[in-house]
């Protein structure tokens, strides 16, 4: 016990650093090196000890187990837990004892067990030297201790494999007591399941670990990195199972034998591959690995591992491990230490594993020869897998899960994760939380699930208590690991959901949670481990590969599966080998799953896993470069395994294998890089992507280094991944079919990966990769944090969905699920998935969602939740499901678009196809728009016809947009997607929009806004057909007009799909830009895209001029798309277009004019276009240009909305990239679509616009108003509005179109009506709320306003409510709407909160300007001054959208100032202003609204304000959308920075007026002098406590009223003190003392302007000089000074004492200089006072 305690203490002290090393090291090669080195040293120790295998191994067994404690002990929590649990139970003695007695009790290897017990005891005695030395060594190299222990484990394992099996079986028996003991000792120490619940489970897990696993685990933990990491992983993973099951024991015994006997070195070494492979096994079949070994033992493992390796490999492994122990002794020291040690920690943070695979590869290469042996050890494990298979048979579903970790390699890997779970969980409990996250994720999923399915593991169950308990404990622990883990950030979000989700939603979450958790783990694991994610995050991978089956299987087995997540975390190590592993695993898993798909049972799962583990070793070995041979060997072996499954589903397998492997590879890249971080991500992604893509299984693994292969295979759509990529492309609107090559790992992976995430995965799943990119776009924080943030925002599910979705989606969805589900759908058609999706949309939609992994499960799980759906592809698949159902095919097609398109596309289905994905969205938007546009204007009619659908679709779509934006926003991918933002955004938005739109809109909108929209492909759109081939490809898709459409569609789709990628590409151009730029760009780009979209749309709408302009618009928009998107040129360039269009493009009535106007508008809008550029420039610009083209008002409306949207949009835009993100998206969607439509409609004829607007707007409204629609539901306001607006819009649209010419007066007035439309747009501007609100106010503005005004008001009840829930919507509405209604007092009020927030904080201002403008301006003035107001509104609209309105800044500034001044009145004033100067105001606000809005919103939007100051015009907008704003703010935070860039780009980020206006609050501070005085007073106040109340009051009141008040009461009796600082002179009159003090201080203070220090001194000196006379003179001078000094004069009269008192102070002060005066004054004061 003492020894154990010592060891633990040492381990805790020493291993903690070790763990730190692990934690830190896993990031680089160090984990392996550092670990390897220290373990190597201990290993010799162990090796000397090793000779006495019987005795010392027994001793070493305890020692071995102790080291794991050491690592755990390393953790602060371990120590803490030691205290809590007690070092003794914690000590190797007690911990091993539970196992030793069990092995002893378990007479299977009675001698061995006894020996082992003896070993433990001997080890207890012996370990003190070893352990303390090891631990001592451990501090330097924490793994040193583990090395000896590991060799101990090796020795022990060699002798005690059977023993271990028996012991493991016995531990199961003893698990109850042992776990209790473990609970006491290991619980705290373990911290596996967060300690007592899970830890006990892992305490249970630790039991075998103690014997074998603990030796391995401890050895692994301490020396584990050298030897035991794999073994420990296996055994640790096994450990739960070993403890849990005799089968596990047997399995682990098998493994432990091989591992214990030879595993120490061999496992250490082979297990590195094994660890990677185990990680893979654990990762790929991590869950499957166990079942693979359990069930796989029978089905997969038997045919692969069990027969070949169970017996032979057992001996062979023992033998091989013995030799390998020698080989691995050095190599494992390094390899295990690095890969294994790194894997353990890397399990958590082995994302460095990508680097470590380099290390691991070198290290694994050493095991290269051993890796085959490792494979055999795998096989060895797989014979144990046979035991786990009984586990499965035993009904140990969890044991399957556990078995998954338990799977030899899986267990090695599981031990990497599970062990990290025990170890790392303990570590995280101890503060160093490396793997715990993963492990806990696994455990979270696994343990939470384990207790569920782990009925036979009573001890485990008991330790777990309930799933929930474990989950909670996990959650708690996860909280620990979350931060520390390399994946800590991920873990933070990801792990807790797993436990929580898994536990709470064990069954549901088993399915969805597996997807989510697995996905999350995939996000973590998968991201951390990419491939390992699929294999490792077998839950994820299963969710991916087996999503239907595994999702279901893991529903049944999913509880076990959550362990997969736990294991999937572990696959992070697998990331080394996981690429290959996932491939094989994907292959195998897919194979298994294929059969399993039908059988969704643990056994089939196991079968899958059996094959997978077999494959996984290869994968694990593939992790290292050297293991490529082993990988090939295993690939061959797994290939047989694969062959079996392949036989089952050769094609599916191949596809699954290819796709899943590649997906996993991508995920691996995506996942793997994630922990390492973005920097490693790309390389890692490439490497990993390259590695898995070779779908040849072994060949692919062999080609593990074939990034090109991966890309090429992906490009080739090798297997499912290719399809998956295509699918992802489709899903993401990435036309992957043609592009798989481009998109493929390299293009797609990098582009799409980044774009989609590798996009989704990347965005969420692999911030390192796509997310990093995406994060770069969005900001890494945004990528990961943002993703998480919005995921969190969206909900954990989202995050997990995001992780899962992004990743699972990307990976699972793409390959795994796609494979699994798409397999169902025939996802190969996935490119065709657009169609296939479309056709299979339902199957595939679900499947896709399922495919998207996150989709199905999550879809199922989150299906309503659009979070998952949306999230997964999630985001929009989710949305897709919601909206996606109609949009689903679209979105599926596009993933989101096609789905959407599918729905909308029903109408525009062909188009969507034709359009392809983005046609979905585009087709949705573009569909009708396209249709409209396609038909040109005729399509408008179509669009008009579609409006209902569009309205629905668009609304839904846009809503989806908004909400979908939310969703999209929700999904990093969504953001990433942009398409999703478009499609997804609103797909769910539509679905979720209603409830989620608000909430999602907040997240979604904001995210959608900024993320999806901005992210989406706005940049992509920027890339728009130009930048992005897919878009452009779609352009061809769309053909020319389509090209224009496609251009914008491209822009749209591209932006969404391609744009997403383009955003990656173009967006990549401006990653930040992508985020921000995407927001801005996205807005711009989006709008640019929409600009493009609009342009082309307009082009479609106006084939002639519009096409020209559209071309101008499109092209320019395109270039603007990139300019704008890229540079924000859109603002300028795009603005030009926008202006072009908007500017008097009359709605691009005159393209030339448009250009001219464009320039004007560019100038105007350019100004604002900088700001509005996002707004206008972005959508406004584009759309403003489009709008300007007929929608300057629209630009105003849109731009306005853009600005407003940007600003207002914040409201609608979730303001995100400026609210435009949402607004952009939303707005772009809405506005864009709507605006587009509006622009088109308005331009196209207003009717279309009306329809579009009305419908579209309604749609838009519907979208936002989806909230609104839903909110006000209002189809009324919408419909009403639509009619009103539609009519108005229509007519005005027409008028506006031409007359709108923007300018206002004419059609603008109309367009005011149009503006109603525009307002509608402006209304839209608020996005949803804006749409509605603005619409309400804006749209008919007066009518609509009235129409909507009531509705707006009503809406505002709703919008308010919308704002509440729409926040984005309502916020929009409220702000916009509020603004509108805000204009309308209700709205204003509502807006006032917003506005009050700062007048809508600028949004109100801006949106208010918008809304108010609309409402007021447009609404009120609109009727009053339709032309002007419209103009104003337009101006206003222009102001936001239409910076042209900005040109009239005079009013605008005045207004702004007025606004500023009339903070309260602001709304009213604004209303008035809006009516009169609103245009100017707006204009200024346009510039300033973006800024003011930003600023204005800024106050309201405190969160964003931080970064919002500049960009927060948008943030402001974001703020505008209260909820949205919050989300937006959150996302702003995510994207805020990017957006910040964007906003700044956007023009005056915040105008001074805007800011001041925003920060009217500062007015109080205007008295800084007063405050200074106050400060002085405060300073001197201490001296002059006594203040003459009158003087103090008067003088201070005057000089510093606050001070006077402050001091008055306190120093009321004393007149001298309070005023002294500020009003020293003032107080002179009060009393000489006071006066002198004051005078003296007055000299010092120079408080009074009247008196300079010299004057005061001169006056004071005379006073000082004339003491007596001075008294009179002083009184006089005081009076004079009072006259001279305001303070004095005021105070003298007030005091009335001056005559009498002054002499005193005079004398008191002293007659010398000011210095003596004040000194004397002080003295006298003191004396007299």
From Swiss-Prot:
Bias-annotated ranges (Polar residues): 1-12, 738-753, 803-812, 1043-1054, 1406-1419
Keywords per UniProt: ADP-ribosylation, Chromosome, Cytoplasm, Cytoskeleton, Methylation, Nucleus, Phosphoprotein
Motif (Nuclear localization signal): 1629-1635, 1723-1729
SMART domains attached to this UniProt entry: Tankyrase_bdg_C
MF annotations from Gene Ontology: ankyrin repeat binding; cadherin binding; enzyme binding; protein serine/threonine kinase activator activity; protein-containing complex binding
Biased composition (Basic residues): 1577-1586
Modified residues (Phosphotyrosine): 897
Compositional bias annotation for Low complexity: 46-63, 352-363, 500-512, 524-541, 572-583
Tissue and organ expression note: Detected in testis, ovary, lung, skeletal muscle, heart, prostate and pancreas, and at very low levels in brain and peripheral blood leukocytes.
Composition bias, Pro residues: 364-374
Name assigned to this protein: 182 kDa tankyrase-1-binding protein
Native species: Homo sapiens (Human)
